[in-house]
């Protein structure tokens, strides 16, 4: 326990929390060619690679991912949610934060139904999360 005098001389230091999605906290001013500290909820980027990776133990699957170069120049790995996708190299995508627990190094999700990413086909429930339009009533 510190004494009152010690606290007066050197107060409590609050902990600094690191961001879980640091690429969203950086901007880029292309006119001045400098990085800025402007946070954004989503960012646009171009796919440089699309592929599959295997999850950590004890899970087993082929999870779809894309390597994305963002508008701020940072390259990140983003997960492609849902069944099936239409992404390929040079597709323009929108990413949001949110890690995938069983894929190491994947801290971002691609937003389905935005920009070049199509929504999931034939999805009836939870459509808004997968960019699927409401089916026509028959």
Swiss-Prot record:
Keywords from the UniProt entry: Methylation, Ribonucleoprotein, Ribosomal protein, RNA-binding, rRNA-binding, tRNA-binding
Modified residues (3-methylthioaspartic acid): 102
Listed GO biological process terms: translation
Molecular function GO labels: rRNA binding; structural constituent of ribosome; tRNA binding
GO CC, one annotated term: small ribosomal subunit
InterPro entries xrefs: NA-bd_OB-fold, Ribosomal_uS12, Ribosomal_uS12_bac
Region (Disordered): 33-55
Pfam family, one: Ribosom_S12_S23
Keyword Protein biosynthesis belongs to the record: no
Keyword Acetylation (UniProt): no
Annotated HAMAP family: Ribosomal_uS12_B
Complex formation: Part of the 30S ribosomal subunit. Contacts proteins S8 and S17. May interact with IF1 in the 30S initiation complex.
Membership in a protein family: Belongs to the universal ribosomal protein uS12 family.
Annotated function: With S4 and S5 plays an important role in translational accuracy.
Alphabetical list of NCBIfam families matching this protein: rpsL_bact
Designated name of the protein: Small ribosomal subunit protein uS12
Organism whose genome encodes this protein: Bacillus velezensis (strain DSM 23117 / BGSC 10A6 / LMG 26770 / FZB42) (Bacillus amyloliquefaciens subsp. plantarum)
Gene expressing this chain: rpsL
